[in-house]
Amino acid sequence: MRAIIETVFDIFYLVTVLTVGIRMICGSKAGTQFRLFGLMAVVLGAGDSFHLVPRALALCTTGLESYAMPLGLGKWITSVTMTVFYVLLYYVWRKRYQIEGQQNVTAAVYALSAVRVVLCMMPQNQWLTNHTPLAWGILRNIPFALLGLLIIVLFYHSAKQNNDKAFRWMWLTIVLSFGFYIPVVLWADVNPLIGMLMIPKTCAYVWTVLIGYNAMKAETGKQN
């Protein structure tokens, strides 16, 4: 039953974010915040598919243990694409609120992203095995969490300052995604049921994408 529920949910998630992302790309002008948002959604869905598709196959066939290499490779790829996702989200923030300058913030985003990617590339992660070291799981997620925290602060203050009702909950979607993700990193190996928190984490990302899509529809409607 768990295999069926997870598989159906993952298919729904991937189809939703990829469809919304493609529609945003096709329905927006080049160089706009919504074109960037659409690209961000496609990166999210495409990156997650490298992990979720092998996971669905594993759950519906011989089990996770038999798919250690494709699952590990998928997690590896996803760890990088999620970093790219937040870099793109940072530029959505800059475009939406017409931010000029603030090179220190940009430098921090790139520095945290670079450290995260470098840590993900280290062989000590043992991505392609069934048992990845917890210490490295924590280590590579420290810069990722700091990057997320920075994006949370930026969207919270800018949405509040500009009375941006469309994006007023963007910061909360990121808080929720990390809130559900961190326990999985820390304790999923001890208690596999904690891994189920990835479902509400995924829902938080769907909310993120829908915020951008609904804002695009609303603002396009006003222009017409």
Predicted feature descriptions by range:
Residues 3-6, 64-76, 129-142, 191-201:
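Non-cytosolic membrane-interface motifs at loop->transmembrane helix junctions
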Residues 39-53, 74-91, 103-124, 139-151, ...:
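Alpha-helical transmembrane segments of multi-pass integral membrane proteins
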Residues 56-61, 129, 155-160, 188-194, ...:
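A cytosolic-side transmembrane-helix exit/cap motif
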Residues 21-27, 50-106, 120-122, 155, ...:
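Internal transmembrane alpha-helix with an interfacial aromatic "cap," most often the third helix
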Residues 171-217:
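Terminal transmembrane helical module of multi-pass membrane proteins
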Residues 17-26, 87-93, 118-123, 142-168, ...:
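Alpha-helical transmembrane segments in multipass membrane proteins, preferentially the mid-helix core
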Residues 1-18:
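Hydrophobic transmembrane alpha-helical segments in integral membrane proteins
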Residues 26-37, 93-105, 130-133, 156-168, ...:
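Membrane-interface helix-boundary motifs at transmembrane edges
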